[in-house]
Amino acid sequence: MGTNNTSNNNGTTKKMSLEEFLGNDTLGESVWDEEDINLDAISNTTNIDILKQTKAGEHQRDGHQQHPHGGHGPMNRSRFSNAGPFGGGSMGDFANHHHPLQHQQGPPYIVKFSDLPPRFSNFDIEDLFQAKFTKFIKFKLFWEINKNPSISTLKSGSIFDQNFKRDSKVAFVELYTSRDMDKILNYWTTPLKEIYHITTAPAEFEDFKDYSTKVKLLTDPKDDAGKPFITKTQRSKSNPFGSAKPVDTQSKILDIEEKMENLHVEDTTTLRASLIPSSDSMATTATGSKITILKKQTPTEEESHSATPTPKPLSYSEVVERSVVNETSKKGTPLSKLDSPALELQSKPDKSDEFKGGDEQGFEKGGDDKAQLDVSNDKDKGSETDVDKQFTFKNVEREHSMSRTKYNGNHNNNNGNFRGSNRYRGGPNGSSYKGGHNNRGNRGGYRGGSSYNNNNNNTNDNNNNNNNSSSNNNNGSRYHDRQNNEEGLTSDSSLDASGNKKNDFTNSTSNTQQYSIFKPASGFLGQGNNDSIRNNGRGNYNSSGMNGGSRGRGFGRGRGFGRGAYNNRGSRGGRGSSGNYSNYNNRTTDMPL
Protein backbone atom coordinates (compact mmCIF):
# COMPACT_ATOMS: atom_id res chain seq x y z
CA MET A 1 0.00 0.00 0.00
CA GLY A 2 2.80 2.28 0.93
CA THR A 3 4.83 1.22 -2.11
CA ASN A 4 1.89 2.00 -4.33
CA ASN A 5 1.49 5.47 -2.83
CA THR A 6 5.15 6.21 -3.21
CA SER A 7 5.06 4.99 -6.75
CA ASN A 8 2.06 7.14 -7.43
CA ASN A 9 3.65 10.19 -5.88
CA ASN A 10 6.86 9.63 -7.73
CA GLY A 11 5.05 8.94 -10.98
CA THR A 12 2.47 10.88 -12.82
CA THR A 13 -0.92 11.27 -11.12
CA LYS A 14 -3.64 9.29 -12.80
CA LYS A 15 -6.86 11.13 -13.27
CA MET A 16 -10.04 9.22 -12.55
CA SER A 17 -13.20 9.62 -14.44
CA LEU A 18 -16.57 9.75 -12.73
CA GLU A 19 -17.37 6.19 -13.65
CA GLU A 20 -14.09 4.96 -12.26
CA PHE A 21 -14.63 6.94 -9.05
CA LEU A 22 -18.09 5.53 -8.54
CA GLY A 23 -16.91 2.01 -9.33
CA ASN A 24 -13.83 2.18 -7.11
CA ASP A 25 -14.19 -0.10 -4.06
CA THR A 26 -11.10 1.09 -2.29
CA LEU A 27 -12.98 2.98 0.49
CA GLY A 28 -15.70 0.36 0.88
CA GLU A 29 -18.54 -1.14 -0.92
CA SER A 30 -21.19 1.50 0.01
CA VAL A 31 -19.49 4.85 0.01
CA TRP A 32 -22.82 6.73 -0.25
CA ASP A 33 -24.63 4.68 2.34
CA GLU A 34 -27.02 6.99 4.14
CA GLU A 35 -27.11 4.83 7.24
CA ASP A 36 -23.51 5.66 8.03
CA ILE A 37 -24.28 9.44 8.14
CA ASN A 38 -25.29 10.95 11.52
CA LEU A 39 -28.18 13.28 10.77
CA ASP A 40 -28.50 14.46 14.39
CA ALA A 41 -25.04 15.94 14.31
CA ILE A 42 -25.88 17.93 11.20
CA SER A 43 -29.14 19.37 12.64
CA ASN A 44 -27.48 20.73 15.79
CA THR A 45 -26.55 24.43 15.73
CA THR A 46 -22.91 25.15 16.01
CA ASN A 47 -22.02 27.19 19.08
CA ILE A 48 -19.45 29.94 18.59
CA ASP A 49 -18.07 29.53 22.09
CA ILE A 50 -17.50 25.83 21.53
CA LEU A 51 -15.63 26.61 18.38
CA LYS A 52 -13.55 29.21 20.20
CA GLN A 53 -12.68 26.74 22.92
CA THR A 54 -11.87 24.13 20.35
CA LYS A 55 -9.61 26.49 18.46
CA ALA A 56 -7.94 27.64 21.66
CA GLY A 57 -7.30 24.03 22.67
CA GLU A 58 -5.81 23.29 19.30
CA HIS A 59 -3.51 26.34 19.55
CA GLN A 60 -2.36 25.35 23.03
CA ARG A 61 -1.81 21.77 21.97
CA ASP A 62 0.16 22.77 18.95
CA GLY A 63 2.23 25.22 21.06
CA HIS A 64 1.27 28.34 19.11
CA GLN A 65 1.20 31.23 21.65
CA GLN A 66 1.30 34.17 19.21
CA HIS A 67 -1.11 35.33 16.57
CA PRO A 68 0.20 35.02 13.05
CA HIS A 69 -0.32 38.78 12.49
CA GLY A 70 1.24 39.77 15.81
CA GLY A 71 -1.93 40.84 17.59
CA HIS A 72 -1.98 40.08 21.32
CA GLY A 73 -5.13 39.89 23.33
CA PRO A 74 -5.78 39.18 26.97
CA MET A 75 -4.64 35.82 28.27
CA ASN A 76 -2.02 35.86 25.49
CA ARG A 77 -4.57 35.46 22.70
CA SER A 78 -6.25 37.69 20.13
CA ARG A 79 -9.74 38.96 20.87
CA PHE A 80 -11.02 38.83 17.28
CA SER A 81 -8.92 35.91 16.09
CA ASN A 82 -11.85 33.55 16.07
CA ALA A 83 -14.71 36.02 16.09
CA GLY A 84 -16.18 34.85 12.83
CA PRO A 85 -18.60 31.96 12.90
CA PHE A 86 -17.27 30.72 9.60
CA GLY A 87 -13.77 30.01 11.00
CA GLY A 88 -10.43 31.37 9.92
CA GLY A 89 -10.80 34.58 11.97
CA SER A 90 -10.90 36.68 8.82
CA MET A 91 -13.28 39.36 10.31
CA GLY A 92 -11.05 39.85 13.33
CA ASP A 93 -7.91 39.92 11.23
CA PHE A 94 -9.47 42.63 8.93
CA ALA A 95 -10.44 44.77 11.90
CA ASN A 96 -7.05 44.46 13.49
CA HIS A 97 -5.45 45.29 10.19
CA HIS A 98 -7.21 48.70 10.05
CA HIS A 99 -7.29 49.61 13.74
CA PRO A 100 -5.04 48.93 16.68
CA LEU A 101 -5.99 46.06 18.87
CA GLN A 102 -6.36 48.24 21.94
CA HIS A 103 -9.54 49.93 20.44
CA GLN A 104 -11.31 46.60 19.96
CA GLN A 105 -11.06 45.35 23.48
CA GLY A 106 -14.44 44.19 24.78
CA PRO A 107 -17.65 46.16 25.11
CA PRO A 108 -18.75 48.94 25.12
CA TYR A 109 -18.42 49.35 21.33
CA ILE A 110 -18.33 53.13 20.84
CA VAL A 111 -17.77 55.09 17.61
CA LYS A 112 -16.80 58.78 17.58
CA PHE A 113 -18.15 61.16 14.91
CA SER A 114 -16.15 64.40 14.84
CA ASP A 115 -16.20 67.61 12.78
CA LEU A 116 -19.99 67.76 12.88
CA PRO A 117 -21.51 71.11 11.82
CA PRO A 118 -23.03 73.38 14.51
CA ARG A 119 -26.55 72.81 13.18
CA PHE A 120 -26.19 69.05 13.78
CA SER A 121 -28.66 67.86 16.44
CA ASN A 122 -29.99 64.72 18.09
CA PHE A 123 -32.50 64.30 15.31
CA ASP A 124 -29.72 64.16 12.71
CA ILE A 125 -27.96 61.29 14.54
CA GLU A 126 -31.16 59.27 14.71
CA ASP A 127 -31.89 59.98 11.07
CA LEU A 128 -28.42 58.84 10.00
CA PHE A 129 -28.64 55.44 11.70
CA GLN A 130 -32.22 54.91 10.57
CA ALA A 131 -31.19 55.59 6.97
CA LYS A 132 -28.40 53.01 7.24
CA PHE A 133 -30.64 50.39 8.94
CA THR A 134 -28.33 50.22 11.95
CA LYS A 135 -29.31 50.08 15.62
CA PHE A 136 -27.51 51.73 18.50
CA ILE A 137 -27.80 51.69 22.27
CA LYS A 138 -27.33 55.39 23.06
CA PHE A 139 -25.46 58.49 21.90
CA LYS A 140 -24.29 61.85 23.24
CA LEU A 141 -23.46 65.12 21.47
CA PHE A 142 -20.78 67.54 22.71
CA TRP A 143 -19.27 70.76 21.54
CA GLU A 144 -15.75 70.47 20.29
CA ILE A 145 -13.22 71.04 23.09
CA ASN A 146 -11.07 74.14 22.79
CA LYS A 147 -7.68 72.60 23.45
CA ASN A 148 -5.66 75.77 22.90
CA PRO A 149 -7.67 78.84 24.02
CA SER A 150 -6.11 82.26 23.56
CA ILE A 151 -4.88 84.37 26.48
CA SER A 152 -7.62 86.96 25.94
CA THR A 153 -10.22 84.19 25.98
CA LEU A 154 -8.84 82.79 29.23
CA LYS A 155 -8.93 86.25 30.85
CA SER A 156 -12.17 87.74 29.62
CA GLY A 157 -13.93 84.93 27.82
CA SER A 158 -16.96 83.04 29.04
CA ILE A 159 -16.86 79.53 30.44
CA PHE A 160 -18.08 78.11 27.16
CA ASP A 161 -15.44 79.92 25.14
CA GLN A 162 -12.69 78.80 27.54
CA ASN A 163 -13.64 75.11 27.20
CA PHE A 164 -15.49 74.64 23.90
CA LYS A 165 -15.69 75.99 20.39
CA ARG A 166 -18.85 76.72 18.46
CA ASP A 167 -17.34 75.78 15.15
CA SER A 168 -18.05 72.04 15.35
CA LYS A 169 -19.51 69.20 17.40
CA VAL A 170 -18.66 65.58 18.24
CA ALA A 171 -20.89 62.56 18.86
CA PHE A 172 -20.23 59.33 20.75
CA VAL A 173 -22.46 56.40 19.72
CA GLU A 174 -22.56 53.06 21.56
CA LEU A 175 -23.33 50.03 19.40
CA TYR A 176 -24.62 46.53 20.14
CA THR A 177 -21.98 44.39 18.51
CA SER A 178 -18.52 44.66 17.10
CA ARG A 179 -19.94 43.81 13.67
CA ASP A 180 -21.94 47.07 13.66
CA MET A 181 -18.81 48.88 14.66
CA ASP A 182 -16.77 47.28 11.88
CA LYS A 183 -19.53 48.10 9.33
CA ILE A 184 -19.49 51.77 10.30
CA LEU A 185 -15.71 52.02 10.28
CA ASN A 186 -15.36 50.22 6.94
CA TYR A 187 -18.36 51.47 4.90
CA TRP A 188 -19.44 54.80 6.41
CA THR A 189 -16.12 56.55 6.79
CA THR A 190 -15.40 57.41 3.17
CA PRO A 191 -18.91 58.68 2.15
CA LEU A 192 -19.31 60.76 5.28
CA LYS A 193 -15.88 62.28 4.83
CA GLU A 194 -16.34 63.14 1.18
CA ILE A 195 -19.94 64.36 1.31
CA TYR A 196 -20.40 65.84 4.78
CA HIS A 197 -16.76 66.24 5.91
CA ILE A 198 -17.48 64.09 8.95
CA THR A 199 -14.67 62.02 10.43
CA THR A 200 -15.45 58.56 11.80
CA ALA A 201 -13.13 56.72 14.25
CA PRO A 202 -13.27 54.30 17.20
CA ALA A 203 -13.82 56.21 20.43
CA GLU A 204 -11.49 56.16 23.42
CA PHE A 205 -13.04 55.91 26.82
CA GLU A 206 -10.70 58.50 28.34
CA ASP A 207 -11.66 60.98 25.65
CA PHE A 208 -15.34 60.40 26.37
CA LYS A 209 -14.71 61.05 30.11
CA ASP A 210 -12.95 64.32 29.29
CA TYR A 211 -15.95 65.62 27.29
CA SER A 212 -18.39 64.52 29.98
CA THR A 213 -16.42 66.34 32.68
CA LYS A 214 -16.23 69.67 30.88
CA VAL A 215 -19.85 69.71 29.75
CA LYS A 216 -20.89 69.82 33.42
CA LEU A 217 -19.48 73.36 33.59
CA LEU A 218 -22.18 74.63 31.19
CA THR A 219 -25.36 75.77 32.94
CA ASP A 220 -27.04 77.76 30.17
CA PRO A 221 -29.66 75.67 28.30
CA LYS A 222 -28.76 77.56 25.14
CA ASP A 223 -25.36 75.82 25.20
CA ASP A 224 -26.97 72.39 24.82
CA ALA A 225 -25.16 70.58 22.01
CA GLY A 226 -28.22 68.42 21.27
CA LYS A 227 -30.02 71.43 19.83
CA PRO A 228 -29.18 72.95 16.47
CA PHE A 229 -27.15 76.12 16.65
CA ILE A 230 -27.69 78.57 13.77
CA THR A 231 -25.69 81.76 13.72
CA LYS A 232 -27.75 84.78 12.68
CA THR A 233 -25.86 86.73 10.09
CA GLN A 234 -27.25 90.19 9.43
CA ARG A 235 -27.09 91.09 5.80
CA SER A 236 -26.34 94.71 5.15
CA LYS A 237 -28.73 96.21 2.66
CA SER A 238 -27.17 98.23 -0.07
CA ASN A 239 -28.73 101.64 -0.58
CA PRO A 240 -29.97 101.82 -4.18
CA PHE A 241 -29.70 105.60 -4.05
CA GLY A 242 -26.11 105.57 -2.91
CA SER A 243 -25.22 108.49 -0.70
CA ALA A 244 -28.31 110.46 -1.72
CA LYS A 245 -30.94 111.02 0.94
CA PRO A 246 -34.67 111.38 0.30
CA VAL A 247 -36.09 114.89 0.51
CA ASP A 248 -38.51 115.48 3.34
CA THR A 249 -41.42 117.03 1.47
CA GLN A 250 -44.17 115.91 3.81
CA SER A 251 -43.04 118.10 6.69
CA LYS A 252 -42.91 121.13 4.42
CA ILE A 253 -46.41 120.48 3.12
CA LEU A 254 -47.76 120.11 6.65
CA ASP A 255 -46.05 123.33 7.68
CA ILE A 256 -47.62 125.19 4.77
CA GLU A 257 -51.08 123.82 5.55
CA GLU A 258 -50.75 124.83 9.19
CA LYS A 259 -49.83 128.39 8.23
CA MET A 260 -52.74 128.53 5.79
CA GLU A 261 -55.14 127.58 8.55
CA ASN A 262 -53.72 130.15 10.94
CA LEU A 263 -53.84 133.00 8.40
CA HIS A 264 -57.27 132.09 6.98
CA VAL A 265 -56.25 133.50 3.61
CA GLU A 266 -55.33 132.01 0.30
CA ASP A 267 -53.26 134.91 -1.04
CA THR A 268 -50.02 133.48 -2.36
CA THR A 269 -48.10 136.72 -1.80
CA THR A 270 -49.02 136.70 1.87
CA LEU A 271 -48.11 133.05 2.13
CA ARG A 272 -44.73 133.67 0.58
CA ALA A 273 -44.12 136.57 2.93
CA SER A 274 -44.87 134.32 5.89
CA LEU A 275 -42.34 131.78 4.67
CA ILE A 276 -39.54 134.40 4.40
CA PRO A 277 -37.22 134.67 7.46
CA SER A 278 -37.92 137.33 10.08
CA SER A 279 -35.32 139.80 8.76
CA ASP A 280 -36.78 139.68 5.29
CA SER A 281 -40.34 139.84 6.57
CA MET A 282 -39.64 143.08 8.41
CA ALA A 283 -38.36 144.62 5.19
CA THR A 284 -41.44 143.53 3.30
CA THR A 285 -43.83 144.87 5.94
CA ALA A 286 -41.99 148.20 5.90
CA THR A 287 -42.84 148.66 2.25
CA GLY A 288 -46.51 148.76 3.23
CA SER A 289 -47.86 145.58 1.67
CA LYS A 290 -51.44 144.93 2.68
CA ILE A 291 -53.56 141.84 2.80
CA THR A 292 -56.57 142.08 0.55
CA ILE A 293 -59.49 139.82 1.26
CA LEU A 294 -62.15 139.46 -1.41
CA LYS A 295 -65.69 139.72 -0.08
CA LYS A 296 -69.08 140.05 -1.64
CA GLN A 297 -70.10 143.71 -1.90
CA THR A 298 -73.27 144.69 -0.09
CA PRO A 299 -75.92 146.22 -2.36
CA THR A 300 -76.59 149.95 -2.02
CA GLU A 301 -79.93 151.46 -1.04
CA GLU A 302 -80.83 152.41 -4.59
CA GLU A 303 -80.05 148.94 -5.85
CA SER A 304 -81.99 147.37 -3.02
CA HIS A 305 -85.05 149.55 -3.79
CA SER A 306 -84.78 148.97 -7.50
CA ALA A 307 -84.44 145.23 -7.09
CA THR A 308 -87.67 143.34 -7.59
CA PRO A 309 -89.00 141.64 -4.49
CA THR A 310 -88.93 137.90 -4.30
CA PRO A 311 -92.22 136.52 -5.61
CA LYS A 312 -94.38 134.62 -3.19
CA PRO A 313 -94.90 130.93 -3.78
CA LEU A 314 -98.02 130.12 -5.75
CA SER A 315 -100.81 127.93 -4.51
CA TYR A 316 -101.99 124.87 -6.36
CA SER A 317 -105.09 126.59 -7.75
CA GLU A 318 -103.02 129.51 -9.06
CA VAL A 319 -100.63 127.14 -10.78
CA VAL A 320 -103.52 125.31 -12.45
CA GLU A 321 -105.09 128.59 -13.50
CA ARG A 322 -101.90 129.87 -15.10
CA SER A 323 -101.34 126.62 -16.93
CA VAL A 324 -104.85 126.78 -18.41
CA VAL A 325 -104.37 130.39 -19.46
CA ASN A 326 -101.08 129.57 -21.14
CA GLU A 327 -102.59 126.67 -23.05
CA THR A 328 -105.51 128.71 -24.30
CA SER A 329 -103.22 131.57 -25.31
CA LYS A 330 -101.04 129.16 -27.29
CA LYS A 331 -104.08 127.88 -29.16
CA GLY A 332 -104.98 131.44 -30.14
CA THR A 333 -108.32 131.61 -28.34
CA PRO A 334 -109.32 135.26 -27.83
CA LEU A 335 -110.32 135.98 -24.26
CA SER A 336 -112.14 139.27 -23.83
CA LYS A 337 -113.61 140.68 -20.74
CA LEU A 338 -117.10 142.09 -20.62
CA ASP A 339 -117.53 145.73 -19.70
CA SER A 340 -120.98 145.01 -18.40
CA PRO A 341 -121.79 142.34 -15.82
CA ALA A 342 -122.27 138.80 -17.08
CA LEU A 343 -125.68 137.98 -18.44
CA GLU A 344 -127.48 135.21 -16.74
CA LEU A 345 -128.77 132.33 -18.73
CA GLN A 346 -132.52 132.01 -18.95
CA SER A 347 -133.71 128.86 -17.33
CA LYS A 348 -136.95 127.22 -16.57
CA PRO A 349 -138.36 127.25 -13.08
CA ASP A 350 -138.05 123.47 -12.89
CA LYS A 351 -134.26 123.29 -13.47
CA SER A 352 -132.41 120.85 -11.29
CA ASP A 353 -128.72 121.60 -12.01
CA GLU A 354 -127.08 124.96 -11.49
CA PHE A 355 -123.57 126.29 -11.18
CA LYS A 356 -122.62 127.89 -7.90
CA GLY A 357 -119.41 129.76 -7.03
CA GLY A 358 -117.48 132.82 -8.08
CA ASP A 359 -116.03 131.18 -11.20
CA GLU A 360 -119.24 131.25 -13.26
CA GLN A 361 -119.27 132.01 -16.93
CA GLY A 362 -122.31 133.54 -18.57
CA PHE A 363 -123.97 132.12 -21.58
CA GLU A 364 -125.54 134.10 -24.35
CA LYS A 365 -129.26 133.98 -24.46
CA GLY A 366 -130.84 131.97 -27.21
CA GLY A 367 -133.36 134.30 -28.91
CA ASP A 368 -135.77 133.98 -31.71
CA ASP A 369 -134.04 136.58 -33.76
CA LYS A 370 -130.85 135.62 -35.59
CA ALA A 371 -129.74 139.25 -35.71
CA GLN A 372 -129.14 139.23 -31.98
CA LEU A 373 -126.58 136.45 -32.40
CA ASP A 374 -124.90 138.32 -35.24
CA VAL A 375 -124.61 141.48 -33.18
CA SER A 376 -123.08 139.51 -30.35
CA ASN A 377 -120.68 137.92 -32.82
CA ASP A 378 -119.72 141.34 -34.12
CA LYS A 379 -118.89 142.53 -30.63
CA ASP A 380 -116.63 139.46 -30.25
CA LYS A 381 -116.97 139.55 -26.51
CA GLY A 382 -117.50 136.58 -24.24
CA SER A 383 -118.57 136.41 -20.70
CA GLU A 384 -115.77 135.70 -18.25
CA THR A 385 -115.99 135.39 -14.54
CA ASP A 386 -113.53 136.04 -11.77
CA VAL A 387 -110.95 133.28 -11.75
CA ASP A 388 -109.56 134.10 -8.33
CA LYS A 389 -112.62 132.62 -6.58
CA GLN A 390 -113.00 128.94 -5.96
CA PHE A 391 -115.37 126.95 -8.11
CA THR A 392 -117.71 124.40 -6.52
CA PHE A 393 -120.04 122.09 -8.35
CA LYS A 394 -123.27 120.85 -6.90
CA ASN A 395 -124.00 117.42 -8.23
CA VAL A 396 -127.67 116.70 -7.72
CA GLU A 397 -129.99 114.35 -9.41
CA ARG A 398 -130.57 115.56 -12.91
CA GLU A 399 -133.96 115.65 -14.54
CA HIS A 400 -132.53 117.00 -17.71
CA SER A 401 -129.49 115.77 -19.50
CA MET A 402 -126.86 117.96 -21.03
CA SER A 403 -127.85 120.18 -23.86
CA ARG A 404 -127.58 118.84 -27.31
CA THR A 405 -127.40 120.97 -30.38
CA LYS A 406 -129.43 119.64 -33.19
CA TYR A 407 -128.91 120.81 -36.68
CA ASN A 408 -131.35 119.85 -39.38
CA GLY A 409 -130.73 120.01 -43.08
CA ASN A 410 -130.22 123.38 -44.69
CA HIS A 411 -130.04 124.79 -48.19
CA ASN A 412 -126.83 126.67 -47.59
CA ASN A 413 -123.31 126.00 -46.52
CA ASN A 414 -122.68 127.83 -43.30
CA ASN A 415 -119.12 128.23 -42.09
CA GLY A 416 -118.53 128.95 -38.45
CA ASN A 417 -116.00 128.20 -35.78
CA PHE A 418 -116.65 127.38 -32.23
CA ARG A 419 -113.61 126.99 -30.04
CA GLY A 420 -114.33 126.78 -26.35
CA SER A 421 -111.97 127.91 -23.66
CA ASN A 422 -112.00 125.97 -20.42
CA ARG A 423 -110.28 127.42 -17.39
CA TYR A 424 -111.08 124.44 -15.24
CA ARG A 425 -111.50 120.99 -16.64
CA GLY A 426 -115.16 120.19 -16.65
CA GLY A 427 -116.17 123.79 -15.78
CA PRO A 428 -118.21 126.26 -17.77
CA ASN A 429 -116.83 127.49 -21.04
CA GLY A 430 -116.32 131.00 -22.23
CA SER A 431 -117.67 131.38 -25.71
CA SER A 432 -116.50 133.62 -28.47
CA TYR A 433 -117.96 134.17 -31.84
CA LYS A 434 -115.70 134.34 -34.77
CA GLY A 435 -116.82 134.20 -38.33
CA GLY A 436 -114.67 132.93 -41.11
CA HIS A 437 -114.81 131.98 -44.75
CA ASN A 438 -114.03 128.31 -44.51
CA ASN A 439 -115.28 125.33 -46.36
CA ARG A 440 -113.87 123.14 -43.66
CA GLY A 441 -114.79 122.98 -40.01
CA ASN A 442 -112.22 123.51 -37.29
CA ARG A 443 -111.36 121.55 -34.18
CA GLY A 444 -113.43 121.86 -31.07
CA GLY A 445 -112.54 123.57 -27.83
CA TYR A 446 -110.86 122.28 -24.71
CA ARG A 447 -111.90 119.14 -22.94
CA GLY A 448 -115.27 119.35 -21.35
CA GLY A 449 -116.63 121.92 -23.81
CA SER A 450 -118.58 121.34 -27.00
CA SER A 451 -118.02 122.92 -30.36
CA TYR A 452 -120.54 123.93 -32.91
CA ASN A 453 -119.50 124.56 -36.48
CA ASN A 454 -122.09 125.85 -38.87
CA ASN A 455 -121.30 126.50 -42.49
CA ASN A 456 -123.48 129.24 -43.83
CA ASN A 457 -122.16 130.04 -47.26
CA ASN A 458 -124.99 131.74 -49.01
CA THR A 459 -125.11 131.01 -52.68
CA ASN A 460 -126.57 134.41 -53.47
CA ASP A 461 -124.05 136.25 -51.26
CA ASN A 462 -126.75 138.84 -50.58
CA ASN A 463 -127.67 138.00 -47.03
CA ASN A 464 -125.14 139.15 -44.49
CA ASN A 465 -126.40 139.52 -40.98
CA ASN A 466 -123.01 140.46 -39.62
CA ASN A 467 -122.76 144.21 -39.87
CA ASN A 468 -119.05 144.38 -39.07
CA SER A 469 -118.02 141.43 -41.22
CA SER A 470 -116.28 142.13 -44.51
CA SER A 471 -116.58 138.56 -45.74
CA ASN A 472 -119.22 137.30 -48.14
CA ASN A 473 -120.47 134.68 -45.72
CA ASN A 474 -123.00 134.31 -43.05
CA ASN A 475 -120.92 133.64 -39.99
CA GLY A 476 -122.16 130.87 -37.82
CA SER A 477 -122.54 131.18 -34.14
CA ARG A 478 -120.08 129.82 -31.67
CA TYR A 479 -121.65 128.13 -28.79
CA HIS A 480 -120.25 126.28 -25.77
CA ASP A 481 -122.29 123.47 -24.45
CA ARG A 482 -121.41 122.06 -21.02
CA GLN A 483 -121.55 118.36 -20.52
CA ASN A 484 -123.49 119.00 -17.32
CA ASN A 485 -125.54 121.99 -18.56
CA GLU A 486 -128.41 123.03 -16.45
CA GLU A 487 -130.72 123.17 -19.46
CA GLY A 488 -130.97 121.27 -22.69
CA LEU A 489 -130.52 123.77 -25.51
CA THR A 490 -131.44 122.81 -29.01
CA SER A 491 -130.73 124.64 -32.20
CA ASP A 492 -133.40 124.54 -34.86
CA SER A 493 -132.68 125.83 -38.30
CA SER A 494 -135.45 127.21 -40.45
CA LEU A 495 -135.85 129.42 -43.49
CA ASP A 496 -137.24 132.87 -43.37
CA ALA A 497 -139.18 134.66 -46.07
CA SER A 498 -136.11 135.62 -48.03
CA GLY A 499 -134.94 132.06 -48.17
CA ASN A 500 -132.11 132.51 -45.71
CA LYS A 501 -131.38 130.20 -42.89
CA LYS A 502 -132.52 131.20 -39.48
CA ASN A 503 -131.12 129.65 -36.32
CA ASP A 504 -133.44 129.68 -33.35
CA PHE A 505 -132.09 128.73 -29.99
CA THR A 506 -134.84 127.71 -27.64
CA ASN A 507 -135.01 125.95 -24.35
CA SER A 508 -136.33 122.50 -24.84
CA THR A 509 -136.83 119.73 -22.38
CA SER A 510 -138.78 117.36 -24.53
CA ASN A 511 -135.69 115.73 -25.98
CA THR A 512 -133.72 115.55 -22.77
CA GLN A 513 -132.56 112.23 -21.50
CA GLN A 514 -131.18 111.02 -18.20
CA TYR A 515 -127.35 111.26 -18.14
CA SER A 516 -125.31 108.54 -16.57
CA ILE A 517 -122.14 109.58 -14.73
CA PHE A 518 -120.64 106.14 -15.17
CA LYS A 519 -121.49 106.07 -18.88
CA PRO A 520 -120.29 109.35 -20.36
CA ALA A 521 -120.57 107.85 -23.85
CA SER A 522 -124.06 106.45 -23.39
CA GLY A 523 -124.96 107.19 -27.01
CA PHE A 524 -122.62 104.41 -27.96
CA LEU A 525 -125.13 101.90 -26.61
CA GLY A 526 -127.03 101.95 -29.88
CA GLN A 527 -129.76 104.57 -29.56
CA GLY A 528 -130.85 105.54 -33.04
CA ASN A 529 -132.30 109.05 -32.65
CA ASN A 530 -130.34 112.22 -33.07
CA ASP A 531 -130.60 113.14 -29.43
CA SER A 532 -128.56 110.14 -28.38
CA ILE A 533 -125.39 111.80 -29.59
CA ARG A 534 -124.00 113.92 -26.78
CA ASN A 535 -121.77 116.76 -27.62
CA ASN A 536 -119.34 116.39 -24.72
CA GLY A 537 -115.67 117.03 -24.63
CA ARG A 538 -114.00 118.29 -27.74
CA GLY A 539 -116.35 116.99 -30.36
CA ASN A 540 -117.57 119.22 -33.19
CA TYR A 541 -120.88 119.36 -34.98
CA ASN A 542 -119.80 119.60 -38.57
CA SER A 543 -122.27 120.20 -41.35
CA SER A 544 -121.01 120.46 -44.86
CA GLY A 545 -123.72 120.93 -47.41
CA MET A 546 -126.52 118.89 -48.77
CA ASN A 547 -124.79 115.69 -49.75
CA GLY A 548 -121.49 116.07 -47.93
CA GLY A 549 -120.39 113.95 -45.03
CA SER A 550 -117.91 114.73 -42.31
CA ARG A 551 -114.94 112.73 -41.22
CA GLY A 552 -115.37 113.33 -37.52
CA ARG A 553 -114.05 111.19 -34.73
CA GLY A 554 -116.60 109.29 -32.78
CA PHE A 555 -116.88 108.26 -29.20
CA GLY A 556 -113.43 108.26 -27.70
CA ARG A 557 -111.22 108.38 -30.76
CA GLY A 558 -113.27 106.35 -33.18
CA ARG A 559 -113.98 107.66 -36.64
CA GLY A 560 -117.43 108.83 -37.73
CA PHE A 561 -119.31 108.54 -40.98
CA GLY A 562 -116.36 108.94 -43.28
CA ARG A 563 -115.28 111.43 -45.87
CA GLY A 564 -117.98 113.22 -47.84
CA ALA A 565 -118.42 112.07 -51.36
CA TYR A 566 -119.43 115.32 -53.10
CA ASN A 567 -118.67 118.33 -50.99
CA ASN A 568 -115.95 119.62 -48.72
CA ARG A 569 -114.55 117.37 -46.08
CA GLY A 570 -115.78 117.78 -42.54
CA SER A 571 -113.59 118.78 -39.67
CA ARG A 572 -111.91 116.53 -37.15
CA GLY A 573 -113.78 115.73 -33.97
CA GLY A 574 -112.42 116.08 -30.48
CA ARG A 575 -111.31 113.54 -27.94
CA GLY A 576 -114.35 113.89 -25.74
CA SER A 577 -117.15 111.51 -25.16
CA SER A 578 -119.25 112.89 -27.99
CA GLY A 579 -118.79 112.18 -31.63
CA ASN A 580 -119.40 114.22 -34.74
CA TYR A 581 -122.81 114.85 -36.05
CA SER A 582 -123.38 115.24 -39.77
CA ASN A 583 -126.60 116.35 -41.41
CA TYR A 584 -127.21 116.26 -45.08
CA ASN A 585 -130.51 118.15 -45.45
CA ASN A 586 -134.04 118.12 -44.22
CA ARG A 587 -134.81 115.06 -46.20
CA THR A 588 -131.83 112.98 -45.11
CA THR A 589 -132.02 110.78 -42.10
CA ASP A 590 -129.30 110.34 -39.53
CA MET A 591 -127.30 107.21 -39.82
CA PRO A 592 -127.16 105.21 -36.63
CA LEU A 593 -123.74 104.55 -35.23
Swiss-Prot record:
Residues 408-426, 449-477, 534-545, 578-587 have a biased composition (Low complexity). DNA polymerase alpha mutation suppressor. Suppressor of group II intron splicing defects of a mutation in MRS2. May play a role in mitochondrial mRNA splicing. This is Protein PSP2. Transmembrane segments: none annotated. Keywords: Cytoplasm, Methylation, Phosphoprotein. Its main location: cytoplasm. The gene is PSP2. The modification Dimethylated arginine is found at residue 443. Coiled coil: none annotated. The keyword S-adenosyl-L-methionine does not apply. The modification Omega-N-methylarginine is found at residues 419, 425, 440, 447, 538, 551, 575.
